[in-house]
Amino acid sequence: RNIRKPLIVMSPKSLLRHKLVVSNLGEMGPRTHFHRVLGEHDRLVLDKKIRRVILCSGKVYYDLLQERRIREINDVAIVRVEQLYPFPWQGLVQQLGRYPHAEVVWCQEEPANMGAWFFVNQRINAILRDFGHQSECVAYVGRRGAASPATGLLSRHVEQQKWIVDQALSGELDKLALPHQRPKY
Protein backbone atom coordinates (compact mmCIF):
# COMPACT_ATOMS: atom_id res chain seq x y z
CA ARG A 1 0.00 0.00 0.00
CA ASN A 2 1.31 3.42 -0.90
CA ILE A 3 -0.83 5.23 1.64
CA ARG A 4 0.85 7.04 4.51
CA LYS A 5 -1.31 7.25 7.61
CA PRO A 6 -0.62 8.40 11.14
CA LEU A 7 0.29 5.59 13.51
CA ILE A 8 -1.63 5.35 16.75
CA VAL A 9 0.12 3.27 19.37
CA MET A 10 -1.86 1.96 22.31
CA SER A 11 0.50 0.52 24.84
CA PRO A 12 0.59 -0.22 28.55
CA LYS A 13 2.68 2.11 30.67
CA SER A 14 5.03 -0.74 31.56
CA LEU A 15 6.55 -0.50 28.08
CA LEU A 16 7.38 3.21 28.26
CA ARG A 17 10.68 2.65 30.06
CA HIS A 18 11.24 -1.02 29.35
CA LYS A 19 14.89 -1.61 28.44
CA LEU A 20 14.01 -3.91 25.52
CA VAL A 21 11.49 -1.54 23.92
CA VAL A 22 13.82 0.57 21.80
CA SER A 23 14.19 1.44 18.12
CA ASN A 24 16.99 3.22 16.39
CA LEU A 25 16.44 6.03 13.91
CA GLY A 26 17.29 3.76 11.00
CA GLU A 27 14.20 1.70 11.79
CA MET A 28 11.79 4.64 11.65
CA GLY A 29 13.47 7.33 9.58
CA PRO A 30 12.99 8.24 5.93
CA ARG A 31 12.51 5.42 3.43
CA THR A 32 11.29 3.02 6.08
CA HIS A 33 7.91 1.35 6.29
CA PHE A 34 5.72 -0.40 8.80
CA HIS A 35 6.35 -4.14 9.15
CA ARG A 36 3.20 -6.16 9.73
CA VAL A 37 5.19 -9.18 10.90
CA LEU A 38 8.55 -9.02 12.68
CA GLY A 39 10.65 -12.16 12.58
CA GLU A 40 13.23 -13.44 15.00
CA HIS A 41 16.15 -11.09 15.72
CA ASP A 42 18.26 -13.04 18.22
CA ARG A 43 20.90 -15.51 17.12
CA LEU A 44 19.44 -18.97 17.55
CA VAL A 45 20.15 -22.44 16.19
CA LEU A 46 19.71 -23.06 12.46
CA ASP A 47 16.15 -22.42 11.25
CA LYS A 48 15.58 -26.11 10.47
CA LYS A 49 16.49 -27.01 14.07
CA ILE A 50 14.02 -24.60 15.67
CA ARG A 51 11.72 -26.68 17.90
CA ARG A 52 8.92 -24.15 18.43
CA VAL A 53 7.70 -20.90 16.90
CA ILE A 54 5.75 -18.61 19.20
CA LEU A 55 3.45 -16.17 17.42
CA CYS A 56 2.29 -13.25 19.52
CA SER A 57 1.16 -9.66 19.41
CA GLY A 58 1.74 -6.86 21.87
CA LYS A 59 3.42 -6.65 25.26
CA VAL A 60 3.69 -10.39 25.86
CA TYR A 61 6.52 -10.45 23.31
CA TYR A 62 8.83 -8.67 25.74
CA ASP A 63 7.95 -11.06 28.58
CA LEU A 64 8.71 -14.02 26.30
CA LEU A 65 11.94 -12.50 24.98
CA GLN A 66 13.23 -11.61 28.42
CA GLU A 67 12.52 -15.06 29.87
CA ARG A 68 13.96 -16.83 26.83
CA ARG A 69 17.20 -14.88 27.23
CA ILE A 70 17.34 -15.57 30.98
CA ARG A 71 16.87 -19.32 30.39
CA GLU A 72 19.26 -19.24 27.40
CA ILE A 73 16.77 -21.09 25.21
CA ASN A 74 18.05 -21.05 21.63
CA ASP A 75 15.63 -23.36 19.82
CA VAL A 76 12.43 -21.31 20.21
CA ALA A 77 11.75 -18.49 17.74
CA ILE A 78 9.39 -15.62 18.57
CA VAL A 79 7.52 -13.93 15.72
CA ARG A 80 5.54 -10.74 16.34
CA VAL A 81 2.32 -10.08 14.47
CA GLU A 82 2.20 -6.29 14.56
CA GLN A 83 -0.93 -5.82 12.43
CA LEU A 84 -3.87 -8.16 12.75
CA TYR A 85 -6.11 -6.61 10.10
CA PRO A 86 -5.80 -6.84 7.22
CA PHE A 87 -4.30 -10.19 8.14
CA PRO A 88 -0.61 -10.40 7.17
CA TRP A 89 -0.81 -13.60 5.10
CA GLN A 90 2.43 -13.10 3.18
CA GLY A 91 4.47 -12.13 6.22
CA LEU A 92 3.34 -15.16 8.20
CA VAL A 93 3.83 -17.53 5.26
CA GLN A 94 7.37 -16.21 4.93
CA GLN A 95 8.16 -16.52 8.64
CA LEU A 96 6.55 -19.93 9.18
CA GLY A 97 8.26 -21.19 6.03
CA ARG A 98 11.61 -20.58 7.72
CA TYR A 99 10.76 -23.16 10.40
CA PRO A 100 9.13 -26.14 8.61
CA HIS A 101 9.67 -28.65 11.44
CA ALA A 102 8.67 -26.46 14.40
CA GLU A 103 5.60 -26.59 16.61
CA VAL A 104 3.52 -23.44 16.18
CA VAL A 105 2.02 -21.69 19.22
CA TRP A 106 -0.10 -18.56 19.54
CA CYS A 107 0.59 -16.83 22.86
CA GLN A 108 -1.47 -14.02 24.35
CA GLU A 109 -1.94 -12.68 27.84
CA GLU A 110 -5.56 -11.68 27.32
CA PRO A 111 -8.31 -14.21 28.01
CA ALA A 112 -9.05 -16.37 24.98
CA ASN A 113 -12.33 -14.59 24.23
CA MET A 114 -10.79 -11.09 24.41
CA GLY A 115 -7.48 -11.24 22.57
CA ALA A 116 -6.69 -12.01 18.95
CA TRP A 117 -6.93 -15.80 19.29
CA PHE A 118 -10.38 -16.31 17.74
CA PHE A 119 -9.42 -14.04 14.83
CA VAL A 120 -6.01 -15.56 14.06
CA ASN A 121 -6.68 -19.22 14.86
CA GLN A 122 -8.29 -20.37 11.61
CA ARG A 123 -6.11 -18.08 9.50
CA ILE A 124 -2.88 -19.51 10.92
CA ASN A 125 -4.26 -23.04 10.54
CA ALA A 126 -5.01 -22.30 6.88
CA ILE A 127 -1.39 -21.23 6.34
CA LEU A 128 -0.08 -24.37 8.04
CA ARG A 129 -2.39 -26.60 6.03
CA ASP A 130 -1.97 -24.89 2.65
CA PHE A 131 1.80 -24.84 2.78
CA GLY A 132 2.30 -28.33 4.16
CA HIS A 133 3.82 -27.28 7.46
CA GLN A 134 4.66 -30.11 9.87
CA SER A 135 2.37 -28.62 12.55
CA GLU A 136 -1.21 -29.60 11.85
CA CYS A 137 -2.65 -26.69 13.76
CA VAL A 138 -1.60 -23.80 15.95
CA ALA A 139 -1.69 -24.39 19.71
CA TYR A 140 -3.07 -21.80 22.13
CA VAL A 141 -1.21 -20.57 25.21
CA GLY A 142 -2.97 -17.95 27.30
CA ARG A 143 -5.66 -17.35 29.85
CA ARG A 144 -8.92 -19.22 29.45
CA GLY A 145 -11.99 -17.30 28.34
CA ALA A 146 -13.37 -15.04 31.06
CA ALA A 147 -16.07 -12.44 31.65
CA SER A 148 -13.54 -9.96 33.00
CA PRO A 149 -10.25 -8.89 31.40
CA ALA A 150 -8.48 -8.79 34.77
CA THR A 151 -8.12 -11.33 37.54
CA GLY A 152 -8.67 -8.74 40.26
CA LEU A 153 -5.63 -9.85 42.27
CA LEU A 154 -2.08 -8.81 41.40
CA SER A 155 -0.65 -12.03 42.84
CA ARG A 156 -2.95 -14.14 40.64
CA HIS A 157 -2.11 -12.03 37.59
CA VAL A 158 1.64 -12.49 38.18
CA GLU A 159 1.16 -16.24 38.71
CA GLN A 160 -0.86 -16.58 35.50
CA GLN A 161 1.59 -14.45 33.51
CA LYS A 162 4.49 -16.62 34.67
CA TRP A 163 2.53 -19.74 33.70
CA ILE A 164 1.76 -18.34 30.24
CA VAL A 165 5.40 -17.51 29.51
CA ASP A 166 6.59 -20.87 30.86
CA GLN A 167 4.08 -22.85 28.81
CA ALA A 168 4.81 -20.89 25.64
CA LEU A 169 8.56 -21.46 25.94
CA SER A 170 8.67 -25.03 27.19
CA GLY A 171 5.22 -26.51 27.81
CA GLU A 172 4.17 -29.80 26.24
CA LEU A 173 1.57 -29.06 23.56
CA ASP A 174 -0.50 -32.16 24.24
CA LYS A 175 -0.91 -31.10 27.88
CA LEU A 176 -2.02 -27.53 27.19
CA ALA A 177 -5.59 -26.62 28.04
CA LEU A 178 -7.90 -25.62 25.22
CA PRO A 179 -8.99 -21.95 25.31
CA HIS A 180 -12.38 -22.84 26.80
CA GLN A 181 -10.94 -25.21 29.44
CA ARG A 182 -9.60 -24.16 32.81
CA PRO A 183 -5.78 -24.40 32.88
CA LYS A 184 -3.93 -25.37 36.04
CA TYR A 185 -1.80 -22.31 36.82
Language model segments and positions:
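Peripheral docking tails and interdomain loops at the edges
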Residues: 1, 7-16, 108-185
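Short coil/turn connectors at secondary-structure junctions
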Residues: 2-6, 49-51, 73-75, 101-102, ...
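Short acidic, glycine/serine/threonine-rich loops at helix termini
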Residues: 18-24, 65-67, 91, 116-119, ...
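Charge-patterned, long linear interaction tracts outside catalytic cores
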Residues: 50-52, 56-58, 64-65, 180-185
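Glycine-rich, anion-gripping cofactor-binding loops and their flanking helix/strand elements
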Residues: 85-104, 108-119, 153
